Amino acid sequence: MINVSFLGLMSGISVLLKTTVIVVGIFEGSNHLEDNGALEGYNDKIMEIVNGYQSFDGKFAEVLPIIGLEKDFPVVVVIGLGKSEDFDENKALKVGGVIYSELNRMKVPDASIVINTDSNVSANIGYGALLRSFKFDKYFVEKKDKNSVYLNKLVLFSKNDPQEVTALFNDLKAEGESIFLARSFVSEPPNILYPETYAQMIYEELSKVGVTVEVFDEDYMKANQMMALLGVGQGSAKKSRLVVMKWNGGDESESPIAFVGKGVTFDTGGISLKPSKGMWDMKYDMAGSASVVGIMRTLAARKAKVNAVGVVGLVENSVDGNAQRPSDVVISMSGQTIEVLNTDAEGRLVLADALWYTQEMFTPKLMVDLATLTGAVVVALGNNQYAGLFSNDDAIANQLIVAGNESGEKLWRLPLDEAYDKLIDSSIADMQNISTKGYGADSITAAQFLQRFVNGVPWVHLDIAGMAWDYEGTEICPKGATGFGVRLLNRFVSKYYESH
């Protein structure tokens, strides 16, 4: 993780001259740099060079390196900030990520950033660089050049009190460290991360920041009649686990917010076997659980004034002679029976018991579940654009949508309706785990299935199948695991439910 620090703009040019690279911003169409005078007599020279490049006019994320401004003068990198009226937290995040990528490509060890913005935006520029600096390279015997990290230190010069900016950044950094943890979990191969080892990793990592963690085995789940969850893992040599995380930062009398995650550490599809091509991606079928771990760690790390509980069901969906069969009937913790027609629609079975358990044990004020639940949501919304949102509560759904827009982790609400609910009625049990009546609406019928295990509690289901893994990378996330949901839920809690 890159080291980010802050100084005041009044520190002067002498401090800037000690760095390898100076990064300065310019808004689209502007005739001056956003340095607030920090570069003193060099502005005109830089602008003369900038104006000489007709292809560069300050559009968002445009980059122009300037070498040899003067003898022994640092390399100057001018970055376009786009239109000034559009520059906000999310743009600042992306600018920070672009700066990191460009400087790392240039193989420089350190740099200073001079962009004349307020404290919050300055902190987010640093945060964007931090988020983009994630690397999962532990399994390389020799680091290849493209996987090397060169940039280790960034200093941002702010017009505001650097202590104020640092305080804002430290809260963001706590969130960022949690996102890195979530990304790392999702990136781990399934022979390393499986229910037993994953549960132990959660315990070790979250105990460090004050989260109370309990790990429950299969005997405990059998005693609680969690046969929907256990049925998913019965074809695997890896034993299923239930992990409960608690953070009590609010009033003792206050009911907690609950986060529930699907943790299928590898999904073969079971007897309803997936095609071999692309099955390697199914190590990230536990991304919902990683997001729950991430938000619980974030709340504890920044000492959030809220009570929260996280519950994740951890299973491996594999195939052997004891594997669950299409047409099996299982009894869930709720007492409702489920006809399992497709063993590859397993995540909803895990969540069915995890949701019911959460309500029974903790009486939460609301529940949010996260799951890479359906490929259909990717068909509907695409990759890395919007997660699907389903809810029985309009107010909470709208709060999450606002939090998503503000954090950049956007949500699109999809319907719940009796017309869809009846599609999962079974002829021999209370319900079946897929619709067999025609085609389409698979994400909706999956959400309808989950709703049958919500007992009078405000609830939101987030289908993050298209958001958990980025095959190309973004300004703030390299190719791979995204940690989607942590920033969204942290904003949701701090904006609407935390005591300030």
Curated annotation (Swiss-Prot):
What's its catalytic activity? Answer: Release of an N-terminal amino acid, Xaa-|-Yaa-, in which Xaa is preferably Leu, but may be other amino acids including Pro although not Arg or Lys, and Yaa may be Pro. Amino acid amides and methyl esters are also readily hydrolyzed, but rates on arylamides are exceedingly low; Release of an N-terminal amino acid, preferentially leucine, but not glutamic or aspartic acids
The question of whether Glycoprotein is a record keyword is answered with no
Pfam families registered for this protein in UniProt = Peptidase_M17 (PF00883), Peptidase_M17_N (PF02789)
What is the stated purpose of this protein?
Answer: Presumably involved in the processing and regular turnover of intracellular proteins. Catalyzes the removal of unsubstituted N-terminal amino acids from various peptides.
From what superkingdom does this record's organism come? Bacteria
User: What pairs make up the disulfide bonds?
Assistant: none
Q: In Gene Ontology terms, what is a biological process of this protein?
A: proteolysis
Which InterPro entries does the annotation name? Leucine_aapep/pepB, Macro_dom-like, Peptidase_M17_C, Peptidase_M17_leu_NH2_pept, Peptidase_M17_N
What name does this protein carry?
A: Probable cytosol aminopeptidase
Note whether Cytoplasm occurs among the keywords: yes
Subcellular location per UniProt equals: Cytoplasm
Against CDD domains, the record matches this protein to: Peptidase_M17
| EC number in record | 3.4.11.1, 3.4.11.10
Where does this protein chiefly localize? Answer: cytoplasm
**Residues involved in Mn(2+) 1 binding:** D267, D344, E346
User: Which positions are annotated as binding Mn(2+) 2?
Assistant: K262, D267, D285, E346
| Any single GO CC term annotated in Swiss-Prot or TrEMBL for this entry | cytoplasm
Catalytic residues of the enzyme: K274, R348
- Organism this protein belongs to: Ehrlichia ruminantium (strain Gardel)
Q: Which family does it belong to?
A: Belongs to the peptidase M17 family.
